[in-house]
C-alpha cells in the first residue's frame, strides 16, 4: 500500500466522518428548530388562552355590572312608585273631613285613653287643623285638654305626667304599621307579581 493510498483512505474516512457530523448536526438542528417551534406554538396558545380568559372575564364583569345597574334602576323605580302611592294615601288621609275624620279621631282617642285611667290631667296633641275637632271631642273626657299642635296627618298623641306614658295614635303611626305589615302585598299588587 502506497502512501498515497493511505492518504486517500484517511481522506475518505475524514470525508465520511465529516458527512456524519454534518448529518448529526443537521438532525440536531432540525430537532432544536422543531422544539423551538413547538415551544413557540405552546407560548402562543398559552397567550391566546390567557387573552381569551381576560376578555371573557372582562365581558362577565361588564355584564354583571350592567345587570346590577339595571336591577338598581328597577328597584329605584319601584321605590319611587311605592313612595308615590304612599304620598297619594297620605293626601287622601289629610283630605278626610267631617264625620269620617271625627269618628277616626274619636276611636284613636278612645284607644289611647285606656292607658290613662285615673290620671288627673291628660294632655292631647293633634294636627293644627284638627284643634277645633279635638277640643270638641275632649268635652266628653274629664281631665283631658288640648295641649297643642303635633306634626301629623291627623289623630292624637296623648300623654300624662302621672303615668309617664306617651301614646302616639296618629294617622301616621297607623299608616306606618299598615304599610310595613302590607308592603309585600302592596308591591305585588302594584307590580302584578304573584305572592
Curated annotation (Swiss-Prot):
Keywords: ATP synthesis, Cell membrane, Hydrogen ion transport, Ion transport, Membrane, Transport. It is a peripheral membrane protein. GO terms for cellular component: plasma membrane; proton-transporting two-sector ATPase complex, catalytic domain. One of its GO terms (biological process) is proton motive force-driven plasma membrane ATP synthesis. Has multiple subunits with at least A(3), B(3), C, D, E, F, H, I and proteolipid K(x). InterPro entries: ATPase_E_C (IPR038495), ATPase_V1_Esu (IPR002842). Gene3D superfamilies: ATP synthase, E subunit, C-terminal, F1F0 ATP synthase subunit B, membrane domain. It comes from Halobacterium salinarum (strain ATCC 700922 / JCM 11081 / NRC-1) (Halobacterium halobium). It is found in: Cell membrane. Belongs to the V-ATPase E subunit family. HAMAP family: ATP_synth_E_arch (MF_00311). Component of the A-type ATP synthase that produces ATP from ADP in the presence of a proton gradient across the membrane. Disulfide bonds: none annotated. GO terms for molecular function: ATP binding; proton-transporting ATP synthase activity, rotational mechanism; proton-transporting ATPase activity, rotational mechanism. This is A-type ATP synthase subunit E.
